[in-house]
């Protein structure tokens, strides 16, 4: 086999690989010999079919298999011989007349085109300084959590006859929504439950029901926001005919042992302990998130190297498609943004470059330090995922068994976390005690006002390139995506009430 490098421009590589016809012929002969004892042909005893007859009958078909196998084997050998690490599976283009190769009259010649993983030096992580935010779980924090827990457990009791509804009360209502006097699709419901002040219905709806009594029939006038999710309702005035069937007031929930028993605990003391431990776990996760974010920022700052264009383009397309998909839920396109689409694309391309750079960095750290994901870790992650789908565990396991990409997406965040932990062990990490609010604050909050389009890329994205780089760098910035819609209000039977739901909220501007 002869390998010639025909292009080495930047990270782009082209190799010309030539395999002598004699080598193909030898492989063909070996395969035909194997077939001799397996093929059953009329007129010949088992194992007595002449190779010449097999060549005449099956020669081209078998030679096709030989060529396919040889291309795969020789392309991998060429990469090893040249010490090249492709970013993606190389594209293969056969050269010359394939018929001549099949007939054994010409060598097998093909061209390999690909981009290589860049070579770069990793920083000395022992010289990297990072700050880790920490906060103490205080008694008053547990008190707040207890009150919130009690609030979620509250029951409602009917108000006295003739009593007026107040904010926080639970109403049972029938309503019919109309625009220009005509009822519209999805604008009606019977026996709908509405907690005044919950914000589940469009702005202005709930406030107008303060003061109503059982038996009242009233009209609620609202204006659907211009950016409302349902295009046929956006920007229009509507009137809802509302009949009040029941008014209930929230009953006081006492912070006592009885409340604890609702959660399977014997006393309020045990409930406080359980809440405290749960909150410590939440604080630790937030602390780690801030550390990881700071680490990724520092890694991005310390390393600069050429990136494979195809990897960046693929990452950009993934980000942009997600962005357009989320815009479509608001009946918008990129043309509706306050910024020129070209500027938004440029900003997202920088995000794509950052993601690819960090992915290559983390993969390099993992490879050089033999960091791997064990079967036990993978099985544990799979079990945790299965617990999210009670009753469907077997289907989930089958899905992962049959989909290697799904397993890869499960492995990626585990690999990344192990690499992050490895770097954190080497780096100079200084703890900084902050308040709970500071710990849970959005790290991008100060920058939100400087952007004029509502978009926020989820930081969690699992993807794996053909070179085996597992990464999802879950806390990288900037975070951008279209504002998510508010969930539809639900009636007791779970049926959505689109007309009465709150419109998509304008999200704070992000990064």
Curated annotation (Swiss-Prot):
PPIase FKBP-type domain boundaries: 168-253
Enzyme Commission designation: 5.2.1.8
Organism: Parvibaculum lavamentivorans (strain DS-1 / DSM 13023 / NCIMB 13966)
Family matches, as Pfam families: FKBP_C, Trigger_C, Trigger_N
Comp. bias (Basic and acidic residues): 455-478, 489-498
InterPro entries noted in UniProt: PPIase_dom_sf, PPIase_FKBP_dom, Trig_fac, Trigger_fac_C, Trigger_fac_C_sf, Trigger_fac_ribosome-bd_bac, Trigger_fac_ribosome-bd_sf, Trigger_fact/SurA_dom_sf
Compositionally biased intervals (Basic residues): 479-488, 499-511
NCBIfam families per UniProt: tig
Summary of the function given for this chain in its UniProt record: Involved in protein export. Acts as a chaperone by maintaining the newly synthesized protein in an open conformation. Functions as a peptidyl-prolyl cis-trans isomerase.
PANTHER family recorded: TRIGGER FACTOR CHAPERONE AND PEPTIDYL-PROLYL CIS/TRANS ISOMERASE (PTHR30560), TRIGGER FACTOR-LIKE PROTEIN TIG, CHLOROPLASTIC (PTHR30560:SF3)
Biological process annotations from GO: 'de novo' cotranslational protein folding; cell division; chaperone-mediated protein folding; protein transport; protein unfolding
Signal peptide range in chain numbering: none
Alphabetic keyword roster: Cell cycle, Cell division, Chaperone, Cytoplasm, Isomerase, Rotamase
Gene, per the UniProt record: tig
Catalytic activity annotation: [protein]-peptidylproline (omega=180) = [protein]-peptidylproline (omega=0)
Region Disordered: start-end pairs: 446-511
Protein name: Trigger factor
GO molecular function, one term: ribosome binding
Family: Belongs to the FKBP-type PPIase family. Tig subfamily.
Localization in the cell: Cytoplasm
Gene Ontology cellular component list: cytoplasm
Domain remark from Swiss-Prot or TrEMBL: Consists of 3 domains; the N-terminus binds the ribosome, the middle domain has PPIase activity, while the C-terminus has intrinsic chaperone activity on its own.
């Amino acid at each position: 086999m002869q390998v010639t490098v025909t292009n080495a421009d930047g990270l782009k590589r082209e190799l010309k690989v030539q395999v002598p016809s004699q080598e193909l012929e030898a492989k063909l002969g070996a395969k035909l010999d194997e077939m001799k004892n397996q093929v059953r042909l009329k007129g010949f005893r088992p194992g007595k079919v002449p190779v010449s007859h097999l060549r005449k009958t099956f020669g081209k078909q078998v030679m096709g298999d030989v060529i396919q196998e040889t291309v795969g084997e020789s392309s991998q050998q060429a990469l090893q011989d040249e010490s090249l690490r492709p970013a993606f599976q190389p594209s293969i283009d056969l050269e010359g007349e394939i018929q001549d190769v099949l007939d054994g009259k010409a060598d097998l010649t093909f061209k390999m085109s690909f981009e290589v993983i860049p070579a770069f030096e990793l920083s000395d992580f022992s010289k990297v300084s990072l700050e880790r935010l920490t906060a103490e779980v205080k008694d008053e924090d547990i008190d707040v959590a207890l009150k919130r827990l009690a609030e979620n457990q509250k029951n409602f009791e009917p108000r006295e006859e003739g009593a007026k509804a107040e904010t926080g009360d639970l109403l049972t209502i029938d309503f019919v929504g109309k625009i220009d006097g005509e009822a519209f699709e999805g604008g009606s419901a019977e026996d709908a439950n509405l907690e005044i002040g919950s914000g589940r219905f469009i702005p202005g709806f709930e406030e107008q029901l303060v003061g109503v009594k059982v038996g009242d029939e009233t009209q609620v006038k609202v204006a659907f926001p211009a950016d409302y999710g349902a295009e046929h309702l956006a920007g229009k005035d509507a009137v809802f005919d509302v009949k009040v069937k029941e008014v209930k007031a929230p009953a006081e929930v006492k912070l006592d042992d009885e409340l604890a028993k609702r959660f399977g605990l014997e006393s309020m003391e045990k409930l406080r302990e359980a809440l405290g431990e749960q909150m410590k776990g939440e604080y630790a996760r937030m602390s780690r998130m801030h550390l990881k974010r700071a680490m990724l920022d520092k890694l991005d700052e310390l390393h600069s190297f050429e990136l494979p264009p195809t990897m960046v383009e693929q990452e950009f397309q993934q980000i942009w498609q997600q962005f357009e998909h989320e815009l479509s839920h608001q009946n918008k396109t990129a043309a509706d943004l306050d910024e020129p689409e070209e500027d938004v694309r440029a900003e997202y391309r920088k995000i794509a470059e950052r993601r690819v750079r960090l992915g290559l960095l983390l993969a390099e750290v993992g490879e050089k330090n033999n960091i791997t994901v064990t079967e036990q870790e993978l099985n544990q992650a799979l079990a945790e995922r299965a617990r999210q789908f009670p009753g469907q565990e077997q289907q989930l396991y089958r899905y992962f068994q049959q989909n290697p990409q799904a397993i890869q997406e499960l492995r990626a965040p585990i690999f990344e976390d192990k690499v992050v932990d490895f770097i954190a062990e080497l780096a100079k990490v200084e703890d900084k005690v902050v308040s709970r609010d500071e710990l849970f604050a959005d790290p991008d909050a100060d920058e939100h006002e400087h952007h004029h389009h509502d978009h926020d890329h989820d930081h969690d994205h699992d993807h794996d390139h053909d070179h085996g780089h597992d990464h999802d760098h879950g806390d990288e910035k900037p975070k951008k995506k279209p504002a998510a819609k508010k969930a539809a209000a639900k009636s007791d039977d779970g049926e959505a009430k689109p007309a009465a739901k709150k419109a998509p909220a304008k999200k704070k501007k992000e990064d």
